[in-house]
């Protein structure tokens, strides 16, 4: 009986120390991680807006890109689709003044298969979205004009849905 009590006590102490270490590491890394995510999002916003944007103004769930004369040149919004092959796909998508025509997108979050689904980050895949209407995207297998990533149709469809989600936010 004493042996069992000793084992339980030892395990409790070890678990308590581990919990304290994890809590400490979380407390010192939480702010830097949050700051990094903000910087990543800000960089993505600048990357997806038209090149002549000089000022970015946050709006209600999206960003407005303007020139020096305060003329609106484009919009950026975050779009999400939970049905990627590896889970959530989160994109920052840029649109022209008409709020429909895609400038480009940048991937914020994706856990797709390396070498297949992660090709959503490559220019070969991403560039085909530029100039297209964000309200009517579909892969060729579904009657659309987007060439799906070979062996990663689920990911390609999720990108189309994430872009549509972003487009809805700027209406």
Question: For each predicted feature, which ranges?
Answer:
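Flexible, solvent-exposed loop/hinge segments and secondary-structure transition points
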Residues: 2-171
